[in-house]
């Protein structure tokens, strides 16, 4: 039986930290579904469709990675894809506390799906989409934080927003 994992996130936008986890996960699992979820507590800069397009572009060399979007419970999505695992990246201890809550709830909802945590490489331990957006908003250098296509999309978003003030 093939090992299938779901790697969820808001990916608003996708960063090198996200890609680190996706690439490493693709080496461990036979198939990885990278699924864009909408976090109801966040207002996204990019639409779900835009985030899917960016993820497809930056993962196109990973032949066992499929990008998708979903609204609903992650465990329901995982079950629909016959996934037995949820893959999550951890940056710091503070991430772990939040992730434990989510993992515990997912286990209550579906005990057949295991959550696997992967530590982000040290060079990305500080990195978050929020930080990237803040730096990009003020024209800071983000070339070492996100792929070129994401950097261009951010510059375009913020230039468009500035022109409509």
Curated annotation (Swiss-Prot):
Record's GO cellular component terms: cytoplasm
Nucleotidyltransferase recorded as keyword: yes
Recorded superkingdom: Bacteria
One BP annotation, GO: coenzyme A biosynthetic process
Gene3D superfamilies: HUPs
Reaction equation(s) it catalyzes: (R)-4'-phosphopantetheine + ATP + H(+) = 3'-dephospho-CoA + diphosphate
EC number: 2.7.7.3
SUPFAM superfamilies: Nucleotidylyl transferase (SSF52374)
Coarse class of the protein's main subcellular location: cytoplasm
Pathway membership, UniProt: Cofactor biosynthesis; coenzyme A biosynthesis; CoA from (R)-pantothenate: step 4/5
UniProt site (Transition state stabilizer): 18
An annotated Gene Ontology molecular function: ATP binding
Cofactor: Mg(2+)
Subunit structure as annotated in this protein's UniProt entry: Homohexamer.
Functional summary from the UniProt entry: Reversibly transfers an adenylyl group from ATP to 4'-phosphopantetheine, yielding dephospho-CoA (dPCoA) and pyrophosphate.
Protein's name according to its UniProt entry: Phosphopantetheine adenylyltransferase
Organism: Anoxybacillus flavithermus (strain DSM 21510 / WK1)
Gene this chain is encoded by: coaD
